[in-house]
């Protein structure tokens, strides 16, 4: 365990950031699942609204550097392709 005051503070901060980032990643997984399930169910309206929500969540995560910007773009692109293929 760290002995310096600054190292202890950095450790506390990293724990907080880790919890926050995990919450964001969980949110990403859930919204992506919503889109995928709507596509499988062939529900066009639900898929479109879920895609909008997923795009927003992925872009926010990329902006906050929780996931890489290109990773977010790739996931949005693949989800959009799946929804467009359905329509």
From Swiss-Prot:
Residues 1-22 are annotated as: Disordered. One of its GO terms (biological process) is translation. Keywords: Ribonucleoprotein, Ribosomal protein, RNA-binding, rRNA-binding. GO terms for cellular component: cytosol; small ribosomal subunit. GO terms for molecular function: small ribosomal subunit rRNA binding; structural constituent of ribosome. Residues 1-19 have a biased composition (Basic residues). Transmembrane segments: none annotated. NCBIfam families: S20. Binds directly to 16S ribosomal RNA. Belongs to the bacterial ribosomal protein bS20 family. PANTHER family: 30S RIBOSOMAL PROTEIN S20 (PTHR33398), SMALL RIBOSOMAL SUBUNIT PROTEIN BS20C (PTHR33398:SF1). This is Small ribosomal subunit protein bS20. The lineage of its organism: Bacteria, Pseudomonadati, Thermodesulfobacteriota, Desulfovibrionia, Desulfovibrionales. The gene is rpsT.
């Amino acid at each position: 365990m760290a002995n310096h005051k600054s190292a202890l503070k950095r450790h506390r901060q990293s724990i907080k950031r880790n919890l926050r980032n995990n919450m964001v990643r969980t949110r990403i997984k859930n919204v992506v699942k919503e889109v995928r399930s709507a596509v499988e169910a062939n529900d066009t309206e639900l898929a479109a609204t879920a895609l909008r929500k997923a795009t927003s969540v992925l872009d926010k995560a990329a902006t906050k550097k929780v996931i890489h910007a290109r990773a977010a773009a790739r996931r949005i692109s693949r989800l959009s392709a799946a929804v467009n293929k359905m329509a």
